From Swiss-Prot:
Protein name per its UniProtKB record: Nucleotide-binding protein M28_Spy0517
Entries under Pfam families matching the protein: PapZ_C, RapZ-like_N
GO terms for MF: ATP binding; GTP binding
UniProt cross-references to InterPro entries, sorted A to Z: P-loop_NTPase, RapZ-like, RapZ-like_N, RapZ_C
Residues that coordinate or bind ATP: 13-20
Family: Belongs to the RapZ-like family.
Record organism: Streptococcus pyogenes serotype M28 (strain MGAS6180)
Keywords of this entry: ATP-binding, GTP-binding, Nucleotide-binding
Keyword set includes GTP-binding: yes
Amino acid sequence: MSDKHINLVIVTGMSGAGKTVAIQSFEDLGYFTIDNMPPALVPKFLELIEQTNENRRVALVVDMRSRLFFKEINSTLDSIESNPSIDFRILFLDATDGELVSRYKETRRSHPLAADGRVLDGIRLERELLSPLKSMSQHVVDTTKLTPRQLRKTISDQFSEGSNQASFRIEVMSFGFKYGLPLDADLVFDVRFLPNPYYKVELREKTGLDEDVFNYVMSHPESEVFYKHLLNLIVPILPAYQKEGKSVLTVAIGCTGGQHRSVAFAHCLAESLATDWSVNESHRDQNRRKETVNRS
């Protein structure tokens, strides 16, 4: 086996306490996630992870939906604990009986242990069966008074690695208005007011990532003024988006064809933000005109 460590979080707890929100939060944090994992399969799955160079941060939901849960969970945990390559923690989500009943009434779903349809009986039985596992858990979160956003933030605070920004990513993209607005954009900025390199013959076939085009776009006084205001607008609001529990913020910058001005601006913005935040840069339409010409 590899001597590289696996960071494993087992997510468990009361049905209706927020495990779906939790596993989605771990996915946003960059964990490899599986919901409703049968306990007997966990050790074999971890062996496969150890043999690859894939993501070694793993979050697994193991709960009462697996009917053989308690016949296997203790041996599974013993197996994990005896493996020096695995660092694991248990996150147990709980809520009051009254809150769980209320949530089940709202969703109109049946409780996995309510054989006769009585939700409260199922909750009480589940609480009794889960009591030993709860006592073993390193993290117990009472979600009774938590909104989904607050639960996501709680998980981010406890399980994100590195800086505060680890659970928050900024997507900076360029696009061409002639090809339509990006549907996933949160913030859209229009730079069509800037001088267009398209009308410079020597720049027409290049993109905003080419040095001469980039310098042409960013050297105009209008560009300098707008870029300064753009940073002053975006930078202060990023912590607020993160605080609200948003995992990805997409900032889109558009020009006519998405080849020159928007590409240069998006590249410049991405580089500036990357000093303090996790940033991905993409250019949706920078080669669109060339592809159209080639097909014609």
